[in-house]
């Protein structure tokens, strides 16, 4: 059975962000605006997205 995936795209720069936000962006595999990654849709990923919700765009794949 196939797991749900979400596409996370960084839309804003992390400049001026807190250490926690910078670490979360790095943990998600992002780094620059317009970078995108596909991750499993689980509680861990949703928690990370919540920390940087103002910097990313999320869509289901």
From Swiss-Prot:
GO terms for molecular function: structural constituent of ribosome. SUPFAM superfamilies: Ribosomal protein L30p/L7e. GO terms for biological process: translation. InterPro entries: Ribo_uL30_ferredoxin-like_sf, Ribosomal_uL30_bac-type, Ribosomal_uL30_ferredoxin-like. Keywords: Ribonucleoprotein, Ribosomal protein. NCBIfam families: rpmD_bact. Belongs to the universal ribosomal protein uL30 family. This is Large ribosomal subunit protein uL30. The gene is rpmD.
């Amino acid at each position: 059975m196939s797991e749900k995936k979400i596409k996370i795209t960084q839309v804003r720069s992390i400049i001026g962000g807190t250490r926690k936000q910078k670490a979360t962006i790095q943990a998600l595999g992002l780094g620059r605006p317009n970078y995108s990654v596909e991750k499993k849709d689980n509680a861990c990923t949703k928690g990370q997205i919540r920390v940087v919700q103002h910097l990313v765009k999320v869509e289901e794949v």
